[in-house]
């Protein structure tokens, strides 16, 4: 099967919005090449990138989406063009260049593996690609992953912020809802910290990948993975609700927290680009939640919130 790769060069501030356009088109694969993020891992010493040479810090990212070359290709390209034009009108400094080429499915489905290496997150997590060998320390909690075409390798700031916060927050036998589980990395991390996790995703590919990773990590007894939205899949209330998605989707989820989160529960919201943090904070406040903690990394924000006493 052939796929049309569309590469959009955009300022780092606009990568989330462009990626969202691709997701709206139903792209099964979206990648973000962010030189500043790459440089941060080189400087941390946790990731070996010597094979890739010097990294040029341009202040821009390349967001790539993959669209099947079938009868829907041209309508989707027109929809993408309209979306990019709308972004240009609102943020003329964002979209700089758009390129397209045809690639074979096996090329884009596996080429990213060259960039995914073992990496340490927080105090104890060691993220290990399934095809890599590592020598763990006795205290390491190994998260073995093959993310395939699902979001979540742990290397992006949004995911690493969540992992660090889970390590600080999760207690044994907590009940956790992971909304938009992607590769399942956050659910697996929480399970290895002793929690019982219900992970959901709208994307059937993500659900399949997450289930495979759950089995790979031998935590199937602590995690259930299901396809659907929180309104139709989740029952009862959780001690902790985690959503590493994007700001607009988080804002849509907030009104449902009253139903799915316990009175003494907490909400972790990540995937929030810096300039949208105030919108999410306002949305939380409007629905009776107070922000306990705000973390930032590489222009991305995580918010930890709980119910205000007066709202219960």
UniProtKB/Swiss-Prot annotation:
Enzyme class: transferase
Gene Ontology BP annotations: methylation
PANTHER family: ELECTRON TRANSFER FLAVOPROTEIN BETA SUBUNIT LYSINE METHYLTRANSFERASE (PTHR43648:SF1)
CDD domains attached to this UniProt entry: AdoMet_MTases
Protein name as annotated: Ribosomal protein L11 methyltransferase
Gene field: prmA
Its job: Methylates ribosomal protein L11.
Positions of S-adenosyl-L-methionine binding: 159, 180, 201, 244
Chemical reaction(s) catalysed: L-lysyl-[protein] + 3 S-adenosyl-L-methionine = N(6),N(6),N(6)-trimethyl-L-lysyl-[protein] + 3 S-adenosyl-L-homocysteine + 3 H(+)
EC numbers: 2.1.1.-
Organism annotation: Desulfitobacterium hafniense (strain Y51)
GO CC terms, sorted: cytoplasm
